[in-house]
UniProtKB/Swiss-Prot annotation:
Keywords: Acetylation, Actin-binding, Cytoplasm, Cytoskeleton. This is Thymosin beta-12. It is found in: Cytoplasm, Cytoskeleton. Gene3D superfamilies: Single helix bin.
Length: 43
């Protein structure tokens, strides 16, 4: 095992074998106001 990547594998990579996926929106982080409201609601 060598630490160097095998460039032959990379150059032979077939992009057509990849599946097309639907991009999902990432969850945005809550704002400070939202966090404070949740803290007060649970307190």
């Amino acid at each position: 095992m060598s630490d160097k990547p095998d460039l032959a594998e990379v150059s032979n990579f077939d992009k057509t074998k990849l599946k097309k996926t639907e991009t999902q929106e990432k969850n945005p982080l809550p704002t400070k106001e939202t966090i404070e409201q949740e803290k007060q609601a649970t307190a």
